[in-house]
Amino acid sequence: MASVEEIRNAQRAKGPATILAIGTATPDHCVYQSDYADYYFRVTKSEHMTALKKKFNRICDKSMIKKRYIHLTEEMLEEHPNIGAYMAPSLNIRQEIITAEVPKLGKEAALKALKEWGQPKSKITHLVFCTTSGVEMPGADYKLANLLGLEPSVRRVMLYHQGCYAGGTVLRTAKDLAENNAGARVLVVCSEITVVTFRGPSEDALDSLVGQALFGDGSAAVIVGSDPDISIERPLFQLVSAAQTFIPNSAGAIAGNLREVGLTFHLWPNVPTLISENIEKCLTQAFDPLGISDWNSLFWIAHPGGPAILDAVEAKLNLDKKKLEATRHVLSEYGNMSSACVLFILDEMRKKSLKGERATTGEGLDWGVLFGFGPGLTIETVVLHSIPMVTN
């Protein structure tokens, strides 16, 4: 009879968790930042607030965003005007829209990841689903499993209302699942739709206005597993370590409250300073075991919370401008898609590395870092190891 220790060892994978495929998706409706102030104040019936509109225009101009994809259309706002008010009861209709659409958008990204992976979906053993948009039972994970036709025995983890750091959280969770379950293949999906946070402008809520200028909709999926079969699977990045911490005395720095009026967004103006002053400690703890202290020797996947955060991190760590190119590109083309952003950036980096004929998936570098920042104020730190392009 096998001992507990023997059973435990047999259940574990031998190698590190590895990202094997990536897929992304967005809604069809695209809005351009250059004329978004006109659009936003028109659809929320707020064109009389001329001074606030000028202020919002300046926020949009400084956002470094070119365009975003948003599920909510002008027609939907005409049908449900309470969504476009600043503080009108609207949670029921928001929930109706979100709980239907979040799994659908997640499905689009998941199908792309599954196609790239190239294996039967019956081989997916675990599903990790994350969204800040809507809550119900059974959850979006259950709906997605059915939409995709996954096995009823798929082991599901549902993460609601984690916010912008959760792209790191899902990778940390998938890493633990893959490494502690031999043969596991984990489908990870982040799907975000801003119907829950959209609202009209108010002179008394400039932090809400910042959110309206930054956030976009999108979904991303990755497949994670240990000990890949190189004959049929194409490794992209290894997940070497993963950690989470929160910054003391920063509980309200980034916050969201679910109320009858939807999810309200609150932001302290010193968030860029809080993150930049604490990020090096996270880096040191993560990379000391590897003997790495030159942050410019890493490839970077940083959640693009906004240009001020990226500028502050860049300045504090003396990063070369090119280090956050992939991050800034995703911010520019999609806006802040909360948990999905870092997975979009991973996709951008491996594509950019392939196009540029780099030696590895990490822009030719071996080691990289993925950061998520969000409510708490919480920081997720994932150490990545790239894969040589010749094995790809």
UniProtKB/Swiss-Prot annotation:
Gene3D superfamilies recorded: 3.40.47.10
Where are the active-site residues found?
Answer: 164
* Enzyme class of the recorded protein, top EC level: transferase
CDD domains from the entry?
Answer: CHS_like
Looking at the record's lineage, which domain of life comes first? Answer: Eukaryota
Question: Per the record's keyword annotation, is Transferase included, yes or no?
Answer: yes
What is a single Pfam family found in this protein's UniProt entry?
Answer: Chal_sti_synt_N
User: Which cellular component, as a GO term, is one annotated location?
Assistant: cytoplasm
- GO terms of molecular function: trihydroxystilbene synthase activity
- Which amino acids does the record list as binding substrate? 55-58, 267, 305-307
Q: Which reaction does it catalyse?
A: 4-coumaroyl-CoA + 3 malonyl-CoA + 3 H(+) = trans-resveratrol + 4 CO2 + 4 CoA
Its induction note reads: By stress.
Q: What does this protein do?
A: Mediates resistance to pathogens which are sensitive to stilbenes.
Q: Give the family per the record.
A: Belongs to the thiolase-like superfamily. Chalcone/stilbene synthases family.
Relate the assembly described in the record.
Homodimer.
Official protein name in the record: Stilbene synthase 2
Q: What is the species of this protein?
A: Vitis vinifera
